[in-house]
């Protein structure tokens, strides 16, 4: 396991904090400059300066790494893994690939891949090896995949965070779709032309990390979350009252007055509803 505790005799605030030991997992190399772009801070504000996402702001400066989620620009060309690197913009690690034609790209790093390994992408059937990318139609049942496309050539959208994957269950009765079970428990159909990459996303211990103190959250750009009952009545439906007061409504509310907790918010008229067989709670769609 790559988790280790932070030991400090002078600071009790980080008594339970844990970190991932990157020295065991990553290569000691700097990011590829040609694949870095400036990432502007928005602090949860839109172009009018209004807060559209609460609890954002004040993070450490970052550079964005250009990730190849599509994997079809360099089909049928072998690529070698040159380094496995940390990415501050996502929970998983990223791998730097050097293609035979000299092109360099970053991809999401599958768990277990090593420097010197070769990966391949194609629009036809190829070997089922770690990091290989191909259409779902050519991947056998039971295989764990990640970086799955929702639309053909649209780039991977599903199963991209640390430790995530989907399992291929088989083909549907029409032959147009492949059925996958996502890590959430949802069972869903994908067009068989959609691509996926073989393997599980790296950094499996990410969910075991204990932040331990407020400063680490602020370093990541996460601001405090204030309870609605601690606010004034003009700031939140739960606000106001003398001392600690109850909600005073028939149900808890969001800051905008809508019902909160246990309310279904999905629009059932979405086209993708027809592709969901069972939701993550196991309910038939």
UniProtKB/Swiss-Prot annotation:
Keywords: Ribonucleoprotein, Ribosomal protein, RNA-binding, rRNA-binding. GO terms for cellular component: large ribosomal subunit. InterPro entries: NA-bd_OB-fold (IPR012340), Rib_uL2_dom2 (IPR014722), Ribosomal_uL2 (IPR002171), Ribosomal_uL2_bac/org-type (IPR005880), Ribosomal_uL2_C (IPR022669), Ribosomal_uL2_CS (IPR022671), Ribosomal_uL2_dom3 (IPR014726), Ribosomal_uL2_RNA-bd_dom (IPR022666). Residues 215-285 are annotated as: Disordered. GO terms for molecular function: RNA binding; rRNA binding; structural constituent of ribosome; transferase activity. One of its GO terms (biological process) is cytoplasmic translation. Residues 256-272 have a biased composition (Basic residues). One of the primary rRNA binding proteins. Required for association of the 30S and 50S subunits to form the 70S ribosome, for tRNA binding and peptide bond formation. It has been suggested to have peptidyltransferase activity; this is somewhat controversial. Makes several contacts with the 16S rRNA in the 70S ribosome. Belongs to the universal ribosomal protein uL2 family. Part of the 50S ribosomal subunit. Forms a bridge to the 30S subunit in the 70S ribosome. HAMAP family: Ribosomal_uL2_B (MF_01320_B). This is Large ribosomal subunit protein uL2. The gene is rplB.
